[in-house]
Every structure is written in C-alpha cells, then in structure tokens.
Amino acid sequence: MNIQDAYNEWSEIYDSNINRTRDLDAKVTRLMLNGRRFPSIVEIGCGTGKNTEFLATIGDSVLAFDFSEKMLAKARQKVTVSHVRFAWADITQPWNCPPASTDLITCNLVLEHIENLNHIFAQAARTLRRGGWLLVNELHPFKQYGGTKARFERGADIVEVDVFIHHISEFIHAAEKNGLKLLKFDEVWHADDMEKPPRLVSFVFVK
C-alpha cells in the first residue's frame, strides 16, 4: 500500500494498537536525548506526535513535518503548546527550512519508506547548524531481512506499507558523503524479543 494512503488510514489506530517498534522508538529517543536542550528542533515524520510531546520539553522551538494529513491532525490535537508548529511536507523534495538554522533533527521510523537516503542526509546537513545533531531511529535491517516491515491491522487483514531495505553501511556512507560524523550508534532489543535480531538501529550524527 502506498505510504500516504497507508498512514492516513493507520492514524485512526496508530496510538492504540500493539506496536513494539513504536514503543521502543519512543523509549530510545528519550534515552538518546534526555538531559540535553536544543534551541531549535526539526522533526521529520512526526506521525501522531508520539515523540513531539517529548521534543517540546527539550526544545525552545519545534517544527514537526509529516506526509500524512491525518497523522498531522492527531498530532495537532495531542500537542498544543505555542512553541511547536506542525506542517505537511514531502521530505523527498527540498525541505522548507533555512540553511544552518537547526540544532537537532530527528527522523524516527521514516527512512524505510525513502528510497534515496542521500537526499535526506543532504537536506539534513544543509539545515543543521555546525555542531547540530541528526538522530535517526529505524527498524533494524536484520528485521527487514526476515520479512518484517511497517504494517497494521484492518479487521482480519494485515496491511503492509511500501518499504525499502537500507543496510547499516548505507546510513553511515550517506552521512559521511554529506559531512556528518557518527557520534553514537546502538542496536536495541525490545524486552519481548531478546533472543531474536535487534528491533531498532539508532544513530546520532553530528555536523
């Protein structure tokens, strides 16, 4: 199912259905960023605002993008503080952000839906200030190799969303090509699947 239609439909149950990857991503985001403060944050793929709520507590200004209008509608209901702004965006196109304007960019469970990683890293590098961070959390490619992908239930049916497999080296090479250095890296398991491949891969790159 194409990405925009899928997430518009998924928005109705995204916050309530069982989703270990969503829950683990929220936990890892908080662990990676807790204790730091950022004057300006751009969130790529904010969804229903599951991480926006947290980002609002560590950022003086937050701009949150998403490709799904219905996901954005949920996020706007959830996060109403004045220093958070939501906007529709197609991140495969040039981003509507001034150069060197942002201290933190977060990209959570988004890049499996993007074919060209280089464009994303190029736009992030252009938007970040010197010393700024790019946090990327993604479904681990080991899970993808086994057939796992973004999906949700529609009654008795399972709806799978269009995805692309990106190896860990692809993230690192795309970052290096655009002048970003790897600062932190982790592979993360959910408590329910400790004997299985890691569920998430997490990177922090710095400009």
What does each of the following model-derived ranges do?
Residues L104-L117:
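A short SAM/SAH-binding and catalytic strip from SAM-dependent methyltransferases
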Residues N96-L104:
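A short acidic, Gly/Pro-enriched loop at the edge of an enzyme's catalytic core
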Residues I44-Q93:
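Class I SAM-dependent methyltransferase SAM/SAH-binding core
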Residues N118-R130:
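A short glycine-rich, Lys/Arg-flanked "PGG" loop and its adjoining helix->strand segment in the class I
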Residues V163-F185:
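Short alpha-helix
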Residues D192-K207:
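Core SAM-dependent methyltransferase catalytic element
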